[in-house]
């Protein structure tokens, strides 16, 4: 029996023993060494040859990833590790650290129970480390810490043993501070990472060695020895004595929970159904015999198998050939194959039980975030996947050859499925198709993928996505239907800052409000009690509130009014950009008694005109997307770096110094960030590290409001000036 065949049969056996399974993610800031670490873990588990590990980038099996040397998608792999006489199945997901691909991290965190947080010893905890750790803790995923690139502290920064320990203490304290602030209350102390219990390891992923306290006690190797091995350039011997995979996978087995343990406290957070029901109990107990519950975290397109959905089985078992129900798309599908991952390969089996990460082919219509269950037992969907930032940059895409148009549309739909953080707008009338993403790099990669699928495209210069809102209040104004028989009286004001924050943090859910149970959340967020009880719809951070009393026929057109409100919020009156942070209050209404005269053709234009008229009367303004920019630069170049920021309408928020390095923290409008990579590199002669994080939207400065409005409108083929309020209210 070949080694590979042995591995496969072992994986198939361990799948049924949840207490011997560990589902883990590796998360870090870009270039802190995640993929190198994953490769060496695989080599240790006998999945790829040891010589190639680190250069092979086994999990970066996309051409673009290998060319750019960064991870773009989250890749999956399963392996077997022996620890203290038992064998464990470890399902590993390598996630991207670049801010443009944060959506993949969010989705991977839903599939795992534990995370190895990799921090570069030289750079310490960076902004993206905080973001990914925050995402992990929000999903109740337990962390352990691996401090990587320790050899560089010794050989490049020439730190001695006591300075090394000082540096480590600082990194660990920072990590624990984040865990204390973000972990669920009952785990704040339990999940602290500690050197003494072995939940912190130190090492070099590139040179394939690691140590933690239990291994030091076992092997007798201490920090002074490490110091010696590194300065004498003898890390190969070190890697034989304390191989990376043994230390890290041992730490994973020892400190990170099995599905059997974690589902008991994770399910209540990610599934809001009845925990006492049969489905609820099956998930809490990781029961392979219970009703089926799978959460899809990712969809990719395979040349041979078509769409492959990756997900986590929380309850029951998913079987080849069975018919399943997709809760989100309300459709049935027949499962063609199920299996687990070994690197980029899928190994098919007959069924995959609760507690495992599964690859499913045949689940047509599945998208990331979909819930799959048995056809006979429809369950409540899992909570939506909330990604921390939203798309801020758009490019227009056209096919080079007109004959490719139909194919382009199909490929764009696929891209939207594969990566839910991309927003795709297909306009078959004008032939202009828009893709919005998290940043320049994100969109470059997507354009490359479209070309790879056989459609040659041309893309426009990147365009920034703006938002519309109001700075003042107005109303009541009257919106009339075309037949003049229906009238709606509307008031408008900005949404309270505290309510905006509650929506952003997910304390207030988006969607049409059913019943009164949401009122409590609105009141807690600081909203007026009367208004809180009357919210009908929360849409894209806007509120629609019915303040009327006893209006006849209002209930019969309630859904139409919300449709009209939502379509108005999708294309605002200033520049046909999305609206955010606006509170629309319906104060009064006159509605025709005859249903024929109050259909969609009458109600929709009336409510839209009323909303647009109110917005144009309430000091409408554009908001622009902002990014936080972190630059780590030698002191001599600090002046050049800050000048780069200030020339881009940026603001310096904070500066900290460590040794001769300075970290500059600033905020810069996304519109000014194009071409920043090249400019900052030349300004600092390549001696800087920088990263960005999306920081929401802020009001565009007054002197730019008019120019940008005209630019956006002209680009969209509209008249340069927006209509005034009386155009809508006349």
Curated annotation (Swiss-Prot):
An annotated GO cellular component = cytosol
Q: Where in the cell is it found?
A: Cytoplasm
Q: Which UniProt keywords apply?
A: Cytoplasm, Elongation factor, GTP-binding, Nucleotide-binding, Protein biosynthesis
In its keyword annotation, does this UniProt entry include Repeat? no
Protein biosynthesis as a keyword? yes
Instruction: Give the main localization category.
Output: cytoplasm
Top-level taxon: Archaea
Q: Which InterPro entries match?
A: EFG_II (IPR041095), EFG_III/V (IPR035647), EFG_V-like (IPR000640), EFTu-like_2 (IPR004161), G_TR_CS (IPR031157), P-loop_NTPase (IPR027417), Ribosomal_Su5_D2-typ_SF (IPR020568), Ribsml_uS5_D2-typ_fold_subgr (IPR014721)
Tell me which Gene3D superfamilies the record gives. Answer: 3.30.230.10, 3.30.70.240, Elongation Factor G (Translational Gtpase), domain 3, P-loop containing nucleotide triphosphate hydrolases, Translation factors
UniProt GO molecular function: GTP binding; GTPase activity; translation elongation factor activity
Q: What's a Pfam family this protein contains?
A: EFG_IV
At which residues is Diphthamide found?
597
Q: Which intervals hold domain tr-type G?
A: 19-260
Q: Per UniProt, where does GTP bind?
A: 28-35, 94-98, 148-151
Which family, according to UniProt?
Belongs to the TRAFAC class translation factor GTPase superfamily. Classic translation factor GTPase family. EF-G/EF-2 subfamily.
Protein function: Catalyzes the GTP-dependent ribosomal translocation step during translation elongation. During this step, the ribosome changes from the pre-translocational (PRE) to the post-translocational (POST) state as the newly formed A-site-bound peptidyl-tRNA and P-site-bound deacylated tRNA move to the P and E sites, respectively. Catalyzes the coordinated movement of the two tRNA molecules, the mRNA and conformational changes in the ribosome.
Matches recorded under NCBIfam families = aEF-2 (TIGR00490), small_GTP (TIGR00231)
UniProt name for this protein: Elongation factor 2
The organism named in the record is Methanothermobacter thermautotrophicus (strain ATCC 29096 / DSM 1053 / JCM 10044 / NBRC 100330 / Delta H) (Methanobacterium thermoautotrophicum)
Q: Which gene encodes it?
A: fusA
